[in-house]
Amino acid sequence: MNKLRNKVIAIGAAIATLLSLTACGSSSSSSGEGVEGGTVHIALNATVTSLDPMITGAYVARDTMRNIYESLVTLKADGSVAPLLAKSYEVSSDNKTFTFKLRTGVKFHNGATMKAEDVVASMQRWIKLSQIGSTFFTGSTVTSPDADTVVITSPKALSTGLYLMADTGRIAAIMPKTVIDKATDTGVQEYIGTGPYKYSSWKKDTNIILEKFADYSSPDGKSDGYSGARTPHADKMEFDFVTDGTTRLTGALSGQYEIGYSLADSQYAQAKASSDVKVEKDEMLETLIFNKQEGIFKDNQKLRQAILASLDMSKIAKAGHQNSDLYNTDGGLMPKTSPLRSESSLDKYNNPDTAAAKKLIQESGYDGSTITFLTTKDYPYMYDESMEIQNELNAVGIKTDIQVLDWASVLQKMFEPGSWDMLISSYSYS
């Protein structure tokens, strides 16, 4: 299994497809059934700065950590919610109270049995520290009326509450209370969850190694997205940090890696032509993000609207992906198959209008100041799209200073409001 990626861009960007390469015959039988034992080698395109799933949203960390950690609920292939560590759940008619009955006998990697107090401590920390929890669940209480029940009560109606708790980004990971008691707001000190694999080692800038958890308690039912049976087959998973795209592709084609992440779209034809790998697709959303906490975009909706009116999303997407099989320009924040999809205001997306943009620039009071624009070459499409965005903004008189950083630094600076005005990023729906 080797990963390429295809993407999506939204404002300011588009929608694309993640491309994955799967090595044929190296990690599965000819019938498609899992083969027991061995090590799965995965080439990640960026380094990991944190293994705390509540704090980091980087998909290279998320995809590693979801093998270690599990949440109360998760997502099926169609995007609907299903139980995971919860046996069942109920939502009150006013969408304020979420009651979870817990599965019993679930073991943590340290040998302890999961209890309600672990879930309470975990969800309290997720609400406090995670981007989703702190944004939507502020003021919520987490209680345990009995040994097998946890209740989350929100002060306001949250019709999407279950979806938010099932999100696979900053995971609402259930950890032992003892781990959380020793953790700081910058991260946990121990990586202990309930997932099919347990943490073995992390060599900074080299790799992360996970080992099969012998006492793993899998949910019942047929596998469906992230729900249902989750049977670990390999003895180990080795996630190597391989930031050079050519090396990842070469390693995938040679069989050195079963999975290769985020290969450049320019490598798509070569990978697709190989009988040694299978190219798989997964949708993701590309976005242009404004810093609204500090700086030029704070309280300046007109300037943000001017940038939207300036951008030709089709040209931007083509600059990043070249092959039209790998993207589509759709301003929706969710895919068309999602129950959370909204069509509101999409008429303004990918509708470049130079005259309208210049009028909005004048109304915004923009004085010609240079906008700090963060991007990275760790994801080649991000850099290529950033250059096209800069060209289009220059054409209407908006100045930008593109700062090229490694992806880990971009993620770090994202939470330093004084160091940037605009950045390009992407989010996987899965």
Model regions and ranges:
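Aromatic- and charge-enriched surface segment that lines or borders ligand/interaction sites
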Residues: 87-132, 145, 151, 297-299
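Surface-exposed binding/hinge segments that line
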Residues: 101, 134-179, 185-203
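Ligand/substrate-recognition segments at binding pockets and active sites
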Residues: 358, 362-429
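C-terminal motif of bacterial Sec signal peptides marking the signal peptidase cleavage site
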Residues: 20-23
